[in-house]
Design a protein with these regions (language model features):
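Juxtamembrane helix-entry segments on the extracytoplasmic side of multipass membrane proteins
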Residues: 1-6, 29-33, 37, 60-66, ...
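Juxtamembrane helix-loop-helix junctions in multi-pass membrane proteins
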Residues: 14-45, 85, 91-93, 165-190, ...
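Specific transmembrane alpha-helical segments of multi-pass solute transporters/efflux pumps
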Residues: 15-23, 48-99, 135-136, 222-240
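Helix-helix packing/entry segments at the starts of transmembrane helices
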Residues: 36-38, 76, 95-101, 169-192, ...
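C-terminal-most transmembrane helix of multi-pass membrane proteins
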Residues: 38-44, 49, 214-216, 250-314
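Hydrophobic transmembrane alpha-helices of multi-pass small-molecule transport proteins
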Residues: 47, 69, 109, 121-141, ...
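Transmembrane alpha-helical segments that form core, pore/gating elements
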Residues: 47, 106-108, 112, 144-203, ...
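C-terminal transmembrane-helix exit sites in multi-pass transporters
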Residues: 49-58, 103-128, 254-273
């Protein structure tokens, strides 16, 4: 990835890390499926309006809309339903660690299903270091719950696997010439339609009291953490591939913890710094440029040392 893609990845991590703040406010008045439906509905309305104001049009071909619905299913509906159900069976810390397996699944799925995102030793080492860093930041004590709630754990892992397949599936939109903004609008529009019956059946929103203090949080999570975030998501996917894109899963805990320290005054613990260091090392391994630079520097030293010991008169 180049500097532009890294900048977009960091911005995406900040937007998704910030969703914890918005969700923390919104869940006081809204059940889970109603909140996520409002989130994608606000994002869909916003992106469709922006496209209209820019004079751009959504695709009308049936095959493209079928792909939008497939993307919405893999990237929103299935993982959300699985993870929400799983979190009712296991502790939230363990659920966060299991969610951090997304890049692990992605490198494996990409290796099997794509011709250009093959697994290398350096990439495997980077993903392992990133996962270890995420575990350290969240707190290794959360792993103590591994012995219980097996079905909940499997549900969270299935959600992470769904995100991995979504990353691979979403590569097709660049191939068929759909822009990042149109793809983001199509996915959240499809997700809005897919989640509507689930939300009505599970949450019975007509029984909820009128919202008082959460509209700002709903709009914030819809505009920033969904609409803008998914435009960046599909731009990174088109430019850098699924494996690099889903490294954002390692950066979200970093973003959330730093935002908590800056905005809410939460304490930064030594394990947070250790986790950030491991995640940084993992990302550097996956990026590869630092490793190539060090290898080339070592090679130059070896060659230079050989020439110093060489006497042309012998």
């Amino acid at each position: 990835m180049g500097g532009r893609e890294w900048a977009m990845l960091l911005a995406l991590a900040v937007l998704w890390g910030g969703s914890f703040f918005f969700n923390g406010v919104a869940v006081r008045e809204l059940p889970s499926f109603t909140l996520v439906w409002l989130r994608v509905a606000v994002a869909a309305a916003t992106l469709l309006l922006v496209l209209r104001l820019l004079g751009l049009h959504m695709p009308t071909e049936g095959r493209i809309w079928a792909a939008f619905f497939g993307m919405g299913l893999l990237n929103n509906v299935l993982p959300f339903a699985l993870i929400v159900w799983g979190q009712h069976q296991i502790a939230s810390g363990l659920a966060s660690i299991l969610n951090a397996t997304t890049p692990l699944f992605t490198v494996l799925v990409a290796h099997l299903l794509t011709p250009d995102e093959k697994l290398t030793r350096l990439k495997a080492a980077g993903v392992a270091a990133g996962f270890a860093g995420a575990v350290l930041m969240i707190g290794p004590d959360a792993l103590g719950g591994l012995g219980t709630g097996v079905l909940g754990q499997l549900a969270c892992l299935a959600g992470a696997l769904s995100y991995a397949f979504a990353g691979i599936f979403g590569r097709r939109f660049k191939r068929i010439g759909v822009t990042s903004m149109a793809t983001a609008a199509g996915q959240v529009s499809a997700s809005t339609l897919l989640l509507l019956p689930v939300m009505l059946l599970v949450d019975h929103p007509w029984t909820l009291p009128a919202l008082r203090a959460t509209w700002g949080a709903v709009v914030g999570v819809g505009l920033l953490s969904t609409a803008l975030a998914y435009v960046l998501y599909f731009r990174i996917l088109a430019a850098a591939g699924a494996t690099n894109l889903l490294l954002v899963t390692f950066l979200i805990p970093v973003s959330a913890i730093l935002l908590g320290a800056l905005v809410l005054g939460e304490a930064l613990l030594p394990r947070h710094f250790g986790g950030m260091a491991l995640i940084g090392a993992g990302l550097a391994c996956i990026d590869g440029r630092l490793a190539r630079f060090l290898f080339e520097r070592h090679q130059k030293r070896v060659v230079h040392g050989s020439l110093e010991g060489f006497d042309p008169q012998i």
